Every structure is written in structure tokens, then in C-alpha cells.
Amino acid sequence: AAAEFFDLDEDEKDRISMRHGGRAWRGWFPVGGELTSGVPDGKEGIYFGSELGHDHPRVRAGVPLHGPNLFPERPADLRDVVLEWMDRVTEVGRAVLSGIALSLDLDADWFDRWCADPTVLFRIFHYPPPPPGFAGSWGVAEHTDYGLLTLLVQDDTGGLEVRVDGRWVEVP
């Protein structure tokens, strides 16, 4: 469903532009619409989060990263796929945190009191080929993710790397 969305023309994707998402930080951004280390990223993407209506107390209070998601008309199944995926990945995150707690000789539910109602930021990125004649690096510059836990899935194209002991290692 995500690939189908990214295949749409920019005018259609722009209907759910992040400029409509406000403090909730939801919606689509174009290639170059985000900067990392001051350099435009060679990706486009969509931001989603926990689905909260306008009447939710955090939304009414204007708490950043809280609010309704912006879903496109097409593909029609993207909404259901994203909401189901976020629920499942949130459960995976809880399981990972339980494993971390156990590895630290803590109770498996040690993180629960701080993560009972997590702020979920779910992003889908598309890295199109660089434009003809482009000589710089393409993708996203070196950075550190924020938040407690980042779970990543990449397609068969690859390209994701992590820095370990000062050297870059490809992630399978």
C-alpha cells in the first residue's frame, strides 16, 4: 500500500502534506522536505502516530506529536494497514523492552510504568533514485535517532548502515 501511495503524483500526495498536520507532526513530505545535518534528505515520507481525535486531552492541550493522522484517499487500504502495523510493532517494542529489562536483571515489566501510553511515531520512507547528474551523497546524512526505541524494516534494496566502533556496517 505504501509503494502505491509513493507512486501517486505529487499533487495527490500533497493533499495530506505535513503542513496540514500541525503540532501532531502527521502527513507527507516531499524529497528534500527534511534536512539532516543541514543537508536536504534524498527521501520522501509519511508520518503517522497513535490515532487520537481532536477531543483527546493531549490534542486539545496542543501536546506535540499527538493528534489525528492524515490518510490519503488512495490507496484505500493504507489506513487499515498502517493502524494494524502500528499496533503490532508497538507490541514488538514492548517485548523488546521486556527483554532488555530481563537482560539487566530487572523484572520483565520494569519499563511498563514509563511506557504504558507511549508516544508512537511511525514513518514510512521512500528513497527514489537520485536525479540525473547528481554528484552528492543520496539518502540521509549521519544522525542519531531520538526516543527510547527505534525499530526498522528495510526492503531488499538495502542501504541502511549503522556505525559500530567508528566504522560503518551494512544492516542486512
Map each language-model feature to its residues.
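Peripheral, non-catalytic segments flanking oxidoreductase cores
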Residues: A1-P172
